[in-house]
Amino acid sequence: MGRYDLALIGFGGVNRALAELISQRGDRLAEELGFALRVVAITDLRAGSLVDTHGIDLAPLLAAEPGELAFAGLPGGSAEPRNEWVIREVPADIVVEATFTNPADGEPALSHARWALAAGKHVCTTNKGPVALACRELKQLAAEHGVGFEFEGSVLSGTPILRTAERMFGGLEITGVQGIMNGTSNYVLGRLEEGVGLRAAIAEAQELGYAEADPTADIEGHDVQLKVMILANEVLGAELCREDVIREGISKITPEDAQDAVSKGLRWKLVGSAARRPDGTVDARVAPVALPGHHPLAGISGPVNAVAFHTDLLGTVTVSGPGAGRIETAYALLSDIIAIHQRHHADDDTAPAHRVPQETSRV
């Protein structure tokens, strides 16, 4: 049985959840998938970095509270993240990038992906920034070095939207996509329908773990804007940049607006959409829309997300599922690793075999 050695870049909720899956279900996953997973490096902005090319013991790290974790006192540990050195030099097969999203320029995640691919390492990421802003470049770099670049979790976390479009719609023409792609805004709009004010609804979403401390990206549509870019570019073959996607958030909608819509059989939703125009260009936008009750997206409530694919032969096909959550997003990373195995090692049904020099076992 082969094995993939992983470098986890960022050790927040998502990569920590992936480490939990590997630690708690590693043997079962290896039996089911036909390959083992081993973490050989972890970097984190606060905790520093930890390297052991014989495999990091994850259990004690996972037992510590996230805010209390410090790698400096451990063998192979450092107070510095050392992201570039870890990505370029530590012998890992797959770099798992799960740092924060920067919608402006994709950094530092974009550099992380570039370094890894140039070093001949596969990359999987949940980070929307590099995927939305530089996907074609990163795919080309991956192809040049014979490695994979996977990003299923960048749109709907664990719900497989991109692979559904890629694998299940062969022979169809997808003419447009339309979706509810942000659980925070969807939850908030639902609470507005119940008469709760915007600030109170956002505070509830933060308490439940749906919203970040700064909810601007969710409420003002920046998060969905990046996701629309990814869908339009990947599914419709567009080449959009952020400025091409018209954006409006939900901050102007009041409880009175939401309740008035419900009384008329409508529901306000923050909808991201992209549609091909007759001339072949793509119209893309994010905006609150009062949807009629029969619309396939109208019944999507709370943190659940959904995307409706408009096709020439099947009409509208809607896929829904969790659009957030650390475990769900970690599963997207696992599905990316499986995709890397299938695309690059399916013929021999093996993952790489490793022989680790003794002198590099701890750094």
Where do the PLM segments sit?
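Rossmann-fold NAD(P)-binding glycine/threonine-rich loop
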Residues: 100-119, 126-166
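Rossmann-like NAD(P)H-binding beta-loop-alpha module
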Residues: 143-211, 218-223
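Substrate-binding/catalytic subdomain of NAD(P)-dependent oxidoreductase enzymes
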Residues: 191, 202-299, 304-306
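Catalytic, metal-anchored helix/loop core of enzyme active sites in primary metabolism
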Residues: 176-181, 186, 204, 209-216, ...
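Conserved active-site and cofactor/substrate-binding residues in soluble primary-metabolism enzymes
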Residues: 9, 13, 17, 37, ...
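Flexible, glycine/charged-enriched surface loops at secondary-structure junctions
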Residues: 30-37, 215-218, 239-245, 270, ...
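General beta-strand structural signal in soluble alpha/beta enzymes
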Residues: 94-97, 124-126, 149-153, 176-179, ...
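N-terminal glycine-/serine-/threonine-rich beta1-alpha1-beta2 phosphate-ribose binding loop
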Residues: 1-118
